[in-house]
Amino acid sequence: MKIRPLNDRLLVKRLAEEEKTAGGIIIPDSAKEKPAEGQVVAVGPGKVSDSGERVALQVKEGDLVLFSKYGGTDVKLDGEDFLIMREDDILGIME
């Protein structure tokens, strides 16, 4: 199934989280937090400004992004977990 985000929304796949700490301690599943990093899989056409013009998004497909911990809506597509979020929920693009 394919999905095309609308307006200023993005489809983001969370990056896998670390299984161990820097000191080598293995983190159990019950103690793990959802990562706030992901890769942009699809982007909408952009936001419509007050003047009626479409403003392109700053992020593009393939960008690695840092997003708000509680931002976005969890969705499951073809057995994989994704987030649909607004561009405003993106805190930065990782380079």
Swiss-Prot record:
Single Gene Ontology MF annotation: unfolded protein binding
The UniProt record lists the keyword Cytoplasm: yes
Subcellular location: Cytoplasm
UniProt GO BP: chaperone cofactor-dependent protein refolding
InterPro entries per record: Chaperonin_GroES (IPR020818), Chaperonin_GroES_sf (IPR037124), Chaprnonin_Cpn10_CS (IPR018369), GroES-like_sf (IPR011032)
Pfam families: Cpn10
Domain of life: Bacteria
Keywords for the protein's UniProt record, in alphabetical order: Chaperone, Cytoplasm
Cross-referenced Gene3D superfamilies: GroES chaperonin
Principal location: cytoplasm
GO CC field: cytoplasm
Family membership noted in the UniProt record: Belongs to the GroES chaperonin family.
Subunit composition and interactions: Heptamer of 7 subunits arranged in a ring. Interacts with the chaperonin GroEL.
Role of this protein: Together with the chaperonin GroEL, plays an essential role in assisting protein folding. The GroEL-GroES system forms a nano-cage that allows encapsulation of the non-native substrate proteins and provides a physical environment optimized to promote and accelerate protein folding. GroES binds to the apical surface of the GroEL ring, thereby capping the opening of the GroEL channel.
HAMAP family (UniProt xref): CH10 (MF_00580)
Protein name per the record: Co-chaperonin GroES
Native species: Desulfotalea psychrophila (strain LSv54 / DSM 12343)
Gene that this polypeptide is encoded by: groES
